[in-house]
């Protein structure tokens, strides 16, 4: 995962101080891109141990169109708890936009289902795109995430905003545009999540996984993560693991947690860091 370390080092060494919504402060750059060949291993960071269980359950939760943390909590995943209401609701975040985008006449669009059909029948299309950025439902920054949910808005605006697929010579590639990226805590999750999603969609459309391309807008290191960043940059990357997926699953909505097996994952110890809310 040298690509990830290069991103981290670039922002640490070349970023500029910038204030942010959380009040923590960041070192930030605007515009950066990484590329991962998924045939060369599963891109899970090895210079600190990552919690793959949370990544898989969150992705399945998105694909199921869910926006309440009950499923996550029932599976020991707490990564969304800080923004949810007392009843566990997060408003129309990723899952709702992926599976139930508001359309005309009160109807909704299932972007994921449409994407699968397009890849199968129009693989050369330049419209193989999923968007989670719905301006009408973005939260009001002057009130809390919970109050936004009560007003029918998202608890948080989507950070990983839009992704596009590309089919060439039987291989499926994906490019993600991420408008805002917490490099130390969030980006390892994002890389693994979209790499896995690409592999899943490739399987159900009869393709091989290609590249995952990760494009950033505001890529930042929080000021209270810089010590941890220095620690991680001193570590040497280990060989990438592989991800085995149950080959019997042919429906993108048919996957469950037990259909995934991470193999040969070696990682340096976890590095704790505070979350900026």
From Swiss-Prot:
The active site is at 159 (nucleophile). Pathway: Pyrimidine metabolism; dTTP biosynthesis. It is an enzyme of class 2 (transferase). It comes from Teredinibacter turnerae (strain ATCC 39867 / T7901). Keywords: Cytoplasm, Methyltransferase, Nucleotide biosynthesis, Transferase. GO terms for molecular function: thymidylate synthase activity. InterPro entries: Thymidate_synth/dCMP_Mease, Thymidate_synth/dCMP_Mease_dom, Thymidate_synth/dCMP_Mease_sf, Thymidylate_synthase. GO terms for cellular component: cytosol. It is found in: Cytoplasm. Homodimer. The lineage of its organism: Bacteria, Pseudomonadati, Pseudomonadota, Gammaproteobacteria, Cellvibrionales. DUMP binds at residues 21, 126-127, 179-182, 190, 220-222. Belongs to the thymidylate synthase family. Bacterial-type ThyA subfamily. GO terms for biological process: dTMP biosynthetic process; dTTP biosynthetic process; methylation. This is Thymidylate synthase. HAMAP family: Thymidy_synth_bact (MF_00008). Its main location: cytoplasm. It comes from the Bacteria. (6R)-5,10-methylene-5,6,7,8-tetrahydrofolate binds at residues 51, 182, 276. Its EC number is 2.1.1.45.
């Amino acid at each position: 995962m040298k690509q990830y370390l290069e991103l981290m080092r670039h922002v640490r060494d070349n970023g500029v101080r910038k204030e942010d919504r959380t009040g923590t402060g960041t070192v930030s750059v605007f515009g950066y891109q990484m590329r991962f060949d998924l045939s060369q291993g599963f891109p899970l960071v090895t210079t600190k141990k990552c919690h793959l269980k949370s990544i898989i359950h969150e992705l399945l939760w998105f694909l199921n169109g869910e926006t309440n943390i009950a499923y996550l909590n029932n599976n020991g995943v707490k990564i969304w708890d800080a923004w949810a209401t007392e009843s566990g609701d997060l408003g129309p975040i990723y899952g709702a936009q992926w599976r139930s985008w508001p359309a005309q006449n009160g109807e909704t669009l299932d972007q994921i289902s449409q994407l699968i059909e397009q890849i199968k029948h129009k693989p050369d299309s330049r419209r193989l795109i999923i968007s989670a950025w719905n301006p009408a439902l973005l939260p009001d920054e002057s009130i809390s995430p919970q109050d936004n949910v009560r007003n029918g808005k998202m608890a948080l605006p989507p950070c990983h905003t839009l992704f596009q697929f590309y089919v060439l010579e039987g291989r499926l590639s994906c490019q993600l545009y991420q408008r805002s990226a917490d490099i130390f805590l969030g980006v390892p999750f994002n890389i693994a999540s979209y790499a896995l999603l690409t592999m899943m969609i490739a399987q159900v459309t009869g393709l091989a996984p290609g590249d995952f391309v990760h494009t950033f807008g505001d890529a930042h290191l929080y000021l209270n993560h810089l010590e941890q960043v220095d620690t991680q940059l001193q570590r040497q990357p280990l060989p990438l693991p592989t991800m085995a997926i149950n080959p019997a699953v042919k429906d993108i909505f048919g996957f469950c947690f037990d259909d995934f097996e991470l193999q040969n994952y070696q990682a340096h110890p976890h590095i704790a860091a505070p979350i900026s809310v």
